[in-house]
Amino acid sequence: MMLALGAWMGLAATAYSADYTIGISIWDVSNNPSSVPIIAGMNEAAKAAGVKIVVSDPKWDASAQVDNIRDFVTRRVDAIAVFPIDVVGVLPAVHEAEKAGLPVIGALGKIEGIPYVGVDDLEYGRVHARLMLEALKNTKGPKRIGLFRGTAGGSPDRLRMQGMQEVFKASGADIAIESVTADWSPEKALTGFQDLLQRFPNKGDLQLVASMGNCMIPPSIDWAEQNGRDEIIFTTMDLCKSDVDAVQKGTLYGVAFQDVHDMGKLVVDTLVAMNKAGDYHTLPEFARNPPIIVCTKATFDNCKGRGF
């Protein structure tokens, strides 16, 4: 699905100049909470740079994303940014675009062989694991963590998990992880959480529940409160508005997050800078190592970033 000017809540493709056009395929525009601020950030950067962006919505369909990229090739956009659903499945279309002379970058998900704009997901996982260990510092003995995962096989999920496991192993803590494949969906995460509570019905059986991000944790916090399981500690990655409220209330211990609005700006700014430099292989210095921010209730007032 291609989004034209003003087609979706004023956040979709916005034309500012016909001189340079960026085609963008992003996971799911209507059902993925973080897509809204990302697209807003991209529009802001496009307006400032005087370029045009065209946003396509594959709706979490990997084959549709492949079609998006091929359509961009047919339309002869100047560059393509892909927020990948399937980092392997998208490769043939990426290679076709490159053979056609169109530069492609991966955004918030690494695609083999092309530049990547986004946080280091391996380090993102490490940072979150350290936050979880901090949250569990007063918990003695073995620890069981429920973890809401993203899309199986996607590089953000895989690399974040790898980073978490590295930190847990190095800590020497006795930690068991109960993974819930939630596909970045708050609804699927809640269903998985309800299953965890059935499997571990006694207080103390499940010490902490964490999320890979995308606003998956708040419904489970509410469910825990409603069902007398408020002893469970919660942490998450990413920062949506309901996460903000939960941290301030103290029902969410803390958050490790990237500012997704700024990440949207960064994607466009990076391609504009690459075009000006005539080099689509090397990331500009400003696009390397975007910050990962950690906030808890104790530090929240001093934290910078946007909830979505």
Regions inferred by a protein language model and the residue ranges of each:
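Structural detector of well-ordered beta-strand residues that form the stable sheet scaffold
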Residues: G23, V54, P103-I105, G146, ...
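Flexible loop/hinge segments that line or gate small-molecule binding clefts
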Residues: K52, V87-E123, R130, E134, ...
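Short, hydrophobic alpha-helical segments
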Residues: A49, V73, M132-K137, L197, ...
